[in-house]
Curated annotation (Swiss-Prot):
Transmembrane segments: none annotated. The gene is rcl1. InterPro entries: RNA3'-term_phos_cycl_insert, RNA3'_phos_cyclase_dom, RNA3'_phos_cyclase_dom_sf, RNA3'_term_phos_cyc, RNA3'_term_phos_cyc_type_2, RNA3'_term_phos_cycl-like_CS, RNA3'P_cycl/enolpyr_Trfase_a/b, RPTC_insert. This is rRNA processing protein rcl1. Interacts directly with bms1 and the U3 snoRNA to form a stable subcomplex. Component of the 90S small subunit processome also known as 90S pre-ribosome that consists of the 35S pre-rRNA, early-associating ribosomal proteins most of which are part of the small ribosomal subunit, the U3 snoRNA and associated proteins.
Length: 363
């Protein structure tokens, strides 16, 4: 159960990560000023849904939402994990709910089997393909948790109807996370990707592949993009298509980019836009891309009591990062040190807290 004094926050930017940090630290929080000036003020359906998901993953959590919905109190309980099924609203992608809790489930009482339903690919939120092909392999390598950390895409669901389904499997860790030291990002030596479609012609996926390769092949010959065409019971009711690209370096780093087709966009537009987006991320440099950065920074915070260091590109320095660092300072009393390098990248370092899994079952 949560202990300590109630911490107050204003605004709901990066709310999901704030709630996860509060759960890990066991600190009760009060969040105020949630969309107070909008025509429809107060917490949105997807924010309430994330609170309910945390309630399912924990035991003893208490959530109190004000009458107007512009503020709420969250008192975190113990992280228990286990088998959980959650239906995500179609206003947000599944990645909005899954990405923040990747670290949380490592510190549960029992291994987690989480089934989420909803929209699998969205331009507003991280897609499940990026999580499966870029973020999770990075966490497996740096946190030494092995292949038990897995994400299965059972059904694909495009916006606005959703209907997708994924299953996330996560083990529990017995010791502190190892320190993270990433200073060299190396050179890109290959690019892999997935072009997916739901309830449209299979030719759409092939057109995505050809347009992306047309942009990337002049820079690197080793480009291979898989196609995943879903129809019938393998997907939701909405037609759609998307592409995810992951560039791997000879130092074990990866950069990802994704894009979903919207109204008026052809598969050629989507494929070439995503490829150019990937080139921008590669040019920015750093050892982690913006998708992997939140989980990596949280892992640095929770790692054994040693110095952690990573290098991030300019694309990783955002307003959301500032909010995250303020929340870390408020909830863990920990600070990150910044050092700008001659190359234009930024070196971030912090001292790990030596966080232990006090929830796990003693065997």
């Amino acid at each position: 159960m949560s202990t300590g004094q109630l911490k107050r926050f204003k605004g709901c930017e990066y709310l999901t990560h704030r709630l996860v940090l509060a759960t890990l630290s066991g600190t009760p929080i009060r969040v105020e000023g949630i969309y107070p000036d909008e025509a429809d003020p107060g917490v949105k359906d997807y924010q309430v849904s994330f609170l309910r998901l945390l309630e399912k993953l924990t035991n003893g959590s208490v959530i109190e939402i004000s009458y107007t919905g512009t503020s709420f109190i969250y008192r975190p309980g113990n992280i228990i994990g286990g088998r959980v099924v959650h239906d995500c609203p179609t206003t947000k992608g599944i990645g909005y709910f899954l990405e923040p809790i990747l670290i949380l489930c490592l510190f549960a009482k029992t291994p987690t089997s989480l089934t989420l339903t909803g929209v699998t690919s969205s331009n507003e939120d991280i897609g499940v393909d990026v999580l499966r092909t870029s973020v999770l392999p990075s966490l497996q390598k740096r946190f030494q948790v092995g292949d038990e950390l897995e994400l299965r895409i059972l059904k694909r669901g495009s916006a606005p109807g959703g209907g997708g389904e994924v299953n996330f499997l996560c083990p529990v860790i017995k010791e502190s996370l190892p320190p993270i030291r990433l200073s060299e990002f190396g050179r890109v030596f290959r690019i892999r990707g997935i072009a997916s479609s739901t309830r449209v012609s299979p030719a759409f996926a092939n057109r995505l592949v050809e347009s992306a390769r047309g942009v990337l092949n002049p820079f690197i010959p080793d480009v291979f993009i898989y196609t995943d065409v879903r129809r019938g019971d393998e997907c939701g009711n909405s037609p759609g298509y998307s592409i995810t690209l992951v560039a791997e370096t000879n130092k074990g780093c990866s950069y990802a980019a994704e894009h979903c087709g919207e109204a008026g966009e052809t598969p050629e537009d989507v494929g070439s836009f995503c490829a150019k987006k990937l080139l921008e991320v590669i040019e920015s440099g750093g050892c982690v891309d913006p998708y992997t950065q939140p989980s990596t920074l949280t892992g640095m915070l929770l790692s054994s009591e040693d110095v952690n260091t990573i290098v991030v590109g300019q694309l990783g320095i955002t307003s959301q990062l500032v909010v995250f660092l303020r929340d870390v300072k408020a909830l863990f009393n920990c600070e990150y040190r910044f050092k700008e390098l001659e190359s234009g990248q930024v070196e971030m370092s912090c001292l790990g807290k030596g966080y232990l899994n006090v929830n796990r079952r003693i065997q």
